[in-house]
């Protein structure tokens, strides 16, 4: 059986789809997947053994110059790639009108997705041949696992979902694997940031542990923050700019991770690494870290500035 997945973004949402592939792989011997995903996340599906072909899409970039000659050519090539094969099943796990109209509609095969009451944008359900009811009051991973089970005709396992990508990195770990922690300090929303003074206090509290700390970054202002956090601590390393695959390799070898609410915190969970995620205004209930050894540390008043470093340190030392 050949299946096309439409799950284009965000990083966390793409990662949250992986356990559903593992379920299907175990339920239907020989099943293979192609996957349409935003170009910035195209490395992720390739880490799962059940994925054959990754088809990058660039809707975010294309919409800035939709009718330019270059973008028209890219859109034509994308349409040809999506229509190159007729699929037994197409699963739109995105549930948005944009992806349904620009991607799912083009694909050849029976289209499955969530129904009017279940989809993130109800109008998206009009593009599907088969519509499934999936209750909203459950974690995003479980919703996607249920959608796949209904679309492919098996019972969703009751066990915790398995991302099944950690093994992709086991043979490529860095030489110092298990001897360092990673602090994921960068996120896109200001109210999700933990103050730099708190990060530095936590770094200081870990001095006696003998563990090294690595700080990744993705943009110049994040690099500048990482350098400020590391200043004066000889056991803290500011990493060079890295691809997503390279960051994943660093995370896969970490003894533990401390992160703000960001896509890389979900990548840490997908790699089965112990992680404490710091939450302020967001509710982790339906979209938080999913997996083994995923802990949450929340500010009492939803303001991360009021989450003491000592609280995070105590949780670290008691759990990891």
Language-model segments: residues:
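Catalytic machinery of carbohydrate-active enzymes
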Residues: 1-320
């Amino acid at each position: 059986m050949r299946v096309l997945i439409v799950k284009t973004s965000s990083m966390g949402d793409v990662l949250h789809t992986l356990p559903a592939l593992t379920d299907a792989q175990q339920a239907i011997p020989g099943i293979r997947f192609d996957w349409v995903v935003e170009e910035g996340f195209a490395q992720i599906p390739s880490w799962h053994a059940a994925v054959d072909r990754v088809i990058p899409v660039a809707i975010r970039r294309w919409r800035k110059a939709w009718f330019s000659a270059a973008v028209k050519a890219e859109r034509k090539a994308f349409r040809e790639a999506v229509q190159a094969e007729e699929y037994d099943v197409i699963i739109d796990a995105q549930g948005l009108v944009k992806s349904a109209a620009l991607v799912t509609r083009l694909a050849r095969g029976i289209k499955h997705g969530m129904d009017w009451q279940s989809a993130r944008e109800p109008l998206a359900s009009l593009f599907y041949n088969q519509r499934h009811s999936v209750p909203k009051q459950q974690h995003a991973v479980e919703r996607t696992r249920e959608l796949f089970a209904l679309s492919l005709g098996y019972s969703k396992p009751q066990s915790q979902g398995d991302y099944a990508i950690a093994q992709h990195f086991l043979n490529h770990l860095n030489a110092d694997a298990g001897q360092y922690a990673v602090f994921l300090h960068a996120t896109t929303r200001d109210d999700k940031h933990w103050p730099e003074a708190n990060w530095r206090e936590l770094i200081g509290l870990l001095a006696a542990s003998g563990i090294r700390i690595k700080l990744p970054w993705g943009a110049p202002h994040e690099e500048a923050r990482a350098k400020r956090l590391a200043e004066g601590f000889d056991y803290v390393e500011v990493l060079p700019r890295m691809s997503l695959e390279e960051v994943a390799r660093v995370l896969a070898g970490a003894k533990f991770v401390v992160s703000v609410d960001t896509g890389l915190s979900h990548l840490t969970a997908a790699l089965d690494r112990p992680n404490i995620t710091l939450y302020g205004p967001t509710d982790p209930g339906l979209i938080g870290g999913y997996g083994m050894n995923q802990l949450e540390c929340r500010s009492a008043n939803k303001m991360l500035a009021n989450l003491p470093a000592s609280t995070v340190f105590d949780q670290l030392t008691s759990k990891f």
